[in-house]
Regions:
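Gram-negative outer-membrane beta-barrel transporters
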Residues: 649-651, 794-936, 997-1002
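Short, acidic, small-residue-rich periplasmic hinge/interaction motif at the N-terminus
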Residues: 46, 50-58, 65-70, 95-103, ...
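N-terminal periplasmic accessory domains that precede
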Residues: 116-120, 165-168, 185-191, 200-203, ...
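Periplasmic-side early beta-strands and strand-to-turn transitions of outer-membrane beta-barrels
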Residues: 268-436
Length: 1003
């Protein structure tokens, strides 16, 4: 039954159904006779509807209230006086929808013309009742979403104690943030965290923000500014069923402000200071500025422009721990005199060129007599350089975006948007990369109706002046200090060995435990004599030369065509073409809701001859330029997909069932089908129980699939099987760990050929499979409730994931010219046979070995599980306390795999916040305490423990309504408790800032 209120010549009614009760609780509609506002018929069947919206509590006009017509894209916003005017071709009855931050969204049915509307909205807390679109690709209540989903709206972003909306993601239930740089932060959910997170998708208004060859979004480098962000929706866990192959760990969708709804000129400026303790750098100023302007004309055409610039001094990665301690087989466990600070195989967390653990910068000094024992061998690492000497701490991000919107009709809107960002910072995958003048561009065109979306975009990537830190350190050492081996009289290894023997002769006549530490220290000093020293003009000149050369090899007898100094430049250029469409057929099917969609994506890589090559060219020519200067034909990597989702409610809408099926095809692999089944049951309106089953797949990212780069004489190769042709690393190689164990055993037995053949059983054949997509099977249960008269929200979920074919990297050793298992292959695995050797009186000749780091699938199945609980409670008036606690665990496997997967997630983490958006008139505050447990971080670059830490963030905001301004005074990590978020990552401390926002000028 509808409740009709007489309004003179017209009528207006409340929409019936379940909204009726909520209307009484959260919204008061007062319709009075007057002359200020009206609806009237126009020529050409146009209707003008106008009115005023005020706050019922204080009768003040409400500016910025969104007023739209249900079932269309037509809408407007109220002006500073709360007035609105809307022209439409719709016929009566029609439904108006009013939404505003802090007020319950509500629908009203206008039944006839000439109604005079005066609307007063009742301020109410809206805990837990947000509308989200990401979980099912259609608007729905967050309480009844089929999967876990979190949302930060404008109010939550403004009130957050974090210094930016992007930093605020770290306080969301289930989210773990990894900070590689001030300009580069990477969110993740539900385990297997890495700084280059291929498993977590980030969208801006539905557009994938990834830099294609790097494989991940560069933080918020081309994302929204603080002025243009409207909301953020985060889906922890698999979202592949509707969004495709990259979202098996989760996704974030950053939604920006419509120029129709949010008009005028806005300004934002933040000034902060970090490094206040002066440990890693002098106290440094950070600034961020943004400007936004948006304007709509006749509610038909609108545009917006955003520009933002941020600059500061980065957090420094300078942890001087050793990850290759002397008790490991990759060091010298037989010589305890070399323990601790005396470790000659030192491999520092943030040092490069000393990569003893990976075996790429190690010389094997054989034939030594130590403690009177002949034929002893020492493994000695090159000295290398610290990251702080190789990477500038200055970072910046300049970004611009603009959008044009045109409402073709009341049911269709066409828009074009352009984004560009230039950023510098630090990125980590297998090694650290200094990003410098990286430019990402995005062109997006979209046609959107009330039941369909057609979208297409192209993203353009150029890594600019970036460089890889490891080849920089390697080549600086090799060029100025000499080759690593001991085969040449002027090599670093020969100089080290000669100095070692010289010291022994002058100090007792031999090497013993008593003088071994001093002897190796002296030998390093002598071998390093010609090496360029940080801070000198020679160092800077050599560095500047190397980082501009896009060839990471260095000239040698085996690579005569390589540059004299070697190079380290990261030159990657690509384009990503994407188109997609979805159509809501619910109004046509009637018996259930049906959503269908499809997409196509093409990556285009311009080969640079170093990171990406044209595989149609002969192996020996792939790194050489052609006559026109190019490195061959462009490389294409494609994916196509489609999906269908059915939704049906039962039992008076208490039970809601979801079923979806997605099909994805990449020409390099077999097609994959991704199902999702979910059920949501609502009990007594406020209690919602959820169960979800889904599968997901992930095709290898571009670098995982197609890379072909020599880095420290270890070639990184993609997972596609045809790359193996002529190289043999899949079927003719030994695992790295088995080679380390083999060499340790042989060294302990005199480092002879006989000892090598006697220990051949220690070598393990890698036997790598043809790589395929990664698969996840996920189960999830959840409960959401709004209790105590809308003052308490409880949100709890639990999940269980099973990964098959987990993608990662394994390093393998290929014996040149011979087959694994033969005597020649065994001898080729000796450290002294890294390169081809000739026969001596005691050793056989060897063709040497090649080393590859291969992207491939794990052989084990991995099972991780966890749970998260979030509670929000409105204590008293506007005081709110909120918190979440998160548990994540991975089940241990009984057998070791060919590579370490790296769960890289704390078992326990928690956030607790307390605040009041208006403790006194126009002043609000919020404080957030965050803690996470210690955990083990494992990666190809650094493996080590990450200590537990806690931080306290806080902010006080002063609102100046007459000036349309707000001043936010805040700090993250108030007490400057220094911490790291991952092994090898930067040390983070306190950031103290003041931010000024001026909003809504020149409307």
């Amino acid at each position: 039954m509808k409740k009709i209120i007489s309004t003179g010549k017209g009528q207006i009614s409340r929409v019936t159904g379940n909204r009726r009760l909520r209307s009484k609780l959260f919204l008061l509609l007062i319709v009075t006779c007057g002359s200020a506002s009206f609806a009237r018929a126009q020529g050409g069947n146009l209707i003008d509807i106008s009115g005023q919206v005020v706050d019922q509590q204080n009768k003040q006009a409400l500016a910025g209230v969104s007023v739209s017509i249900k079932g269309s894209i037509a809408g407007t916003v109220t002006d500073d006086a709360g007035n609105f005017k809307l022209r439409t071709k719709f016929k009566f009855p029609l439904t108006l929808v009013f939404t505003s931050i802090g007020f319950q969204p509500q629908e009203f049915e206008v039944k006839s013309i000439e109604s005079k509307l005066y609307i007063a909205l009742l301020t109410q807390t809206n805990l837990g009742k947000e509308v989200v679109v990401t979980a099912s690709r259609v608007p729905e209540s967050r309480l009844r979403s089929p999967v876990a989903i979190e949302k930060l709206d404008i109010r939550a972003i403004r009130e957050s104690a974090a210094p930016s909306f992007y930093d605020a993601l770290e306080n969301v239930k289930g989210v773990q943030m990894t900070t590689s740089s001030l300009t580069f932060k990477v969110p993740n959910t539900r385990g297997f965290n890495i700084p280059n997170n291929f498993r977590f998708m980030q969208l801006v208004d539905g557009v994938d923000m990834q830099a294609a060859t790097l494989g991940v979004p560069l933080g918020n480098a081309i994302g929204p500014t603080e002025l243009d962000i409207a909301s953020v929706e985060i889906t922890p866990g698999a979202a592949s069923a509707l969004y495709g192959m990259n979202a098996i760990n989760g996704m974030a969708n950053l939604l920006t402000k419509s120029p129709f709804t949010y008009q005028g000129l806005s300004f934002y400026h933040k000034t902060g200071v970090n490094h206040v303790d002066g440990i890693d750098d002098a106290p440094s100023i950070l600034t961020e500025t943004a400007i936004r302007y948006a304007k709509a004309f006749n509610n038909r055409f609108a545009f917006k422009i955003n520009i933002g610039y941020m600059q500061g001094t980065d957090w420094r990665s300078n942890t001087r721990l050793d990850q290759n301690t002397n008790n490991l087989k990759s060091a010298n466990p037989g010589f305890p005199a070399l323990n601790g600070a005396n470790n000659v195989a030192f491999d520092g967390w943030n040092k490069y060129g000393d990569d003893a653990l990976a075996g790429s910068n190690v010389v094997s000094l054989s034939g030594l007599t130590i403690n009177g024992n002949p034929n002893q061998t020492l493994r000695v690492a090159r000295t290398g350089y610290w990251e702080t000497d190789l990477v500038s701490p200055r970072v910046s991000n300049l970004k611009f975006d603009a959008a044009l919107h045109y409402r073709i009709s009341e049911k269709a809107e066409l828009s074009y948007s352009y984004r560009i960002g230039n950023m510098s910072g630090v990125f980590q995958r297998g090694n650290k990369v200094r990003l410098d003048n990286v430019v990402i561009q995005n062109h997006h065109i979209e046609l959107k109706g009330n039941n369909f979306v057609i979208s297409g975009y192209v993203s353009i990537e150029n890594t600019g002046d970036s460089y890889n830190v490891k080849p920089l350190a390697d080549n600086m050492d090799l060029y100025s200090g000499g080759a690593t081996d001991t085969k040449k009289p002027d090599s670093w290894g020969t100089k080290y060995k000669n100095a070692l023997l010289e010291y022994a002769t002058k100090n007792g006549g031999g090497l013993t435990d008593a003088n071994l530490a001093a002897a190796t220290q002296y030998a390093r000093e002598q071998a390093d004599a010609s090496r360029v020293k940080p801070g000198t003009p020679e160092f800077n000149q050599l560095k500047n030369t190397i980082i501009k050369i896009n060839n990471w090899d260095i000239k040698s007898s085996s690579i005569p065509d390589a540059p004299e100094t070697g190079g380290a430049a990261l030159v990657q250029k690509s384009r990503l073409y994407h188109t997609e469409a979805q159509w809501d057929l619910s109004s046509k099917v009637k018996i259930f809701d049906l959503l269908i969609g499809g997409d196509a994506r093409v990556y285009e890589i311009i080969p640079d001859g170093n990171n990406f090559v044209d595989f149609s060219r002969p192996i020996d020519d792939r790194n050489k330029p052609e006559a026109d200067g190019s490195f061959g034909a462009n490389i294409y990597y494609k994916k196509f997909g489609s999906f269908a989702q059915v939704t049906k409610t039962f039992f008076d809408e208490k039970l809601k069932l979801f079923g979806s099926l997605r099909w994805d095809y990449n020409p390099e692999f077999k097609p994959k089908y991704t199902p999702r089944l979910a059920a949501v049951y609502t009990f007594k309106e406020n209690h919602n129980f959820r169960f979800t089953y889904q599968q997901g797949y992930r095709f290898p990212a571009l670098f995982e699939a197609l890379s072909y780069v020599n880095n420290g004489r270890v070639k990184r190769v993609g997972s596609l099987p045809y790359i193996n042709e002529g190289l043999g690393y899949l079927e003719n190689s030994y695992t790295q760990q088995s080679v380390i164990n083999f060499n340790a055993a042989v060294s302990a037995q005199g480092n002879t050929d006989e000892a090598a053949l006697a220990n051949r059983n220690l070598l393990v054949v890698a036997d790598l499979p043809d790589a395929g997509p990664e698969k996840i099977v996920s189960y999830e249960v959840g409960y959401k409730a709004v209790l105590l008269n809308n003052r308490l929200v409880i949100d709890i979920d639990a999940y269980s994931n099973q990964y098959n074919g987990f993608l990662g990297q394994v390093q393998v050793f290929v014996p040149k010219g011979v087959s694994v298992g033969t005597d020649a292959a065994v001898l080729a695995m000796l450290d002294r046979n890294r390169d081809a050797t000739t026969a001596t009186s005691t050793t056989a000749a060897s063709q040497g070995q090649d080393r590859y780091r291969v992207f491939t699938n794990a052989k084990n199945t991995y099972h991780n599980f966890g749970s998260a609980l979030a509670i929000t409670y409105n204590l008293y008036k506007k005081f709110t306390v909120a918190g979440n606690i998160n548990f994540n665990e991975m089940k241990a496997n009984k057998t070791e795999d060919i590579f370490v997967t790296g769960f890289n997630t704390p078992r326990w983490s928690t956030n607790l916040s307390f605040g009041n958006r208006e403790i006194v008139k126009n002043i609000g505050f919020n404080v957030t305490w965050r803690w996470q447990d210690s955990f083990l971080w494992e990666s190809p670059l650094v493996t080590g423990g990450v200590a537990a830490y806690s931080t306290l963030d806080g902010q006080v905001t002063f609102h100046l309504p007459k000036l349309k301004s707000a001043v936010k005074l805040g700090a993250s990590d108030i007490f400057n408790h220094r911490y790291i978020q991952y092994a090898g990552g930067p040390t983070i401390g306190g950031l103290y800032y003041v931010a000024v926002t001026v909003d809504g000028l020149l409307k």
